[in-house]
Amino acid sequence: MAVGNVAVPETIYPIEGIKLSATAAGVRYKDRDDLVVIEIATDAATAVVTTKNAFCAAPVRVLREHFAKASPRYLVTNTGNANAGTGADGKRRAIDICAALAAKAGVNNNTVLPFSTGVIGEPLNSEAIIAGLDNALANLAPDNWLAAANGIRTTDTIPKLTSKKVNVAGSHYHITGMSKGSGMIRPNMATMLGYVATDANIAADLLQEMLSAINEQSFNRITVDGDTSTNDCCVLIATGAASSDIIDSPEHPHYQPLFDALAEVFIRLAQLIVRDGEGATKFMTVKVTGGKTTQECCDVAYAVAHSPLVKTAFFASDANWGRILAAVGYAGVEDLDTEQVDVYLDEVMICQNGGVAPTYTEEAGKTVMSRPEITIHIDLARGEAIDTVYTCDLSYDYVKINADYRS
């Protein structure tokens, strides 16, 4: 059961220059869409980031090769099978899918980027995907975002979709995005896919820089189970349909408002993944302040967010704050003065100067821990740096979902 506000927005803005479709190809699931195609306008700029897992999936390898050679026109995603751990045959099948779509659409093979998500180590039924391409291409439409968001789901219990309109000095821009992911989530880029499009006119090189920076604030600041997937990919597309005035540097007056709006969309999509974490009952924000560097704040936040002992304590609504201190201690911060560290659960100080806070009571701790959304605030008191990671608790259902995944 997803935690908190996970509703699809009432208004989903179509992005001029983007068309989508979702089709049932029968890759793994019966009676549901599992093949999603996105068509990108010719003049659009596209940026991509991919998993840092060395055992990356075949479609990721093909995607990287194609993206280095041409500007994308089509994105093709299948669910139910990751096409990872499939060797040379898996790569050939990813290439075959791209070639088939390219031939049907009349574009170069390199302009098609493949994406897969699902079970690792099983041969991909590329024939079923290729057979579904005609229907996918025939049903492309600008208002199919919700269908596409449902089509990319695996163990996700909800479609993950957000959309917003941005007004900047009289110019109107739209941003719409979708993501998928529920388990195997600890991006360095998890089984996580994200697709965001805007009608802003942004230079390709700058768009790539923006995506890399925004990704660090969003998809690279979430964890469900600490596992980095073989298939993570995130795409940002700028079609340019809203304006002929190109944003080509951070000094452009529209750059910062657009950057902030895009970051808001990405953070929302990343948080939706955590809120829908496999078996999750609580959404946790781990905020670390007072660090010497952002990196040490990040290290501490991830140590706490990854800890099975911390996560199970939150599932049990048990204010066992010693587990948080232990995680802070093994995060690898050099010369940490533990007698300066303070820890809060929401508004309740549980640890002051490295020991139990004089004002803390078990009753106050239990009250906070019963909430579905909780912020763990750790103040290292050694600098001005800050960082935040989003995670969820670890429940019995997480084990059941993953134990039963292939059955």
Swiss-Prot record:
UniProt lineage: Bacteria, Pseudomonadati, Pseudomonadota, Gammaproteobacteria, Moraxellales
Q: Which reaction does it catalyse?
A: N(2)-acetyl-L-ornithine + L-glutamate = N-acetyl-L-glutamate + L-ornithine; L-glutamate + acetyl-CoA = N-acetyl-L-glutamate + CoA + H(+)
Cite the record's note on assembly. Answer: Heterotetramer of two alpha and two beta chains.
Query: EC no.?
Result: 2.3.1.35, 2.3.1.1
Active-site positions on this chain: 191
Residues annotated as site: Involved in the stabilization of negative charge on the oxyanion by the formation of the oxyanion hole: 117-118
| Site annotation Cleavage: residues | 190-191
Q: Where does substrate bind?
A: 154, 180, 191, 278, 402, 407
Q: Which UniProt keywords apply?
A: Acyltransferase, Amino-acid biosynthesis, Arginine biosynthesis, Autocatalytic cleavage, Cytoplasm, Multifunctional enzyme, Transferase
Tell me one GO biological process term.
ornithine biosynthetic process
**Which spans are transmembrane here?**
none
What is the organism of origin for this protein?
Answer: Psychrobacter arcticus (strain DSM 17307 / VKM B-2377 / 273-4)
Q: Where in the cell is it found?
A: Cytoplasm
Task: Name the protein family.
Answer: Belongs to the ArgJ family.
Name of the featured protein:
Arginine biosynthesis bifunctional protein ArgJ
Listed pathway(s): Amino-acid biosynthesis; L-arginine biosynthesis; L-ornithine and N-acetyl-L-glutamate from L-glutamate and N(2)-acetyl-L-ornithine (cyclic): step 1/1; Amino-acid biosynthesis; L-arginine biosynthesis; N(2)-acetyl-L-ornithine from L-glutamate: step 1/4
Q: What SUPFAM superfamilies does the annotation carry?
A: DmpA/ArgJ-like (SSF56266)
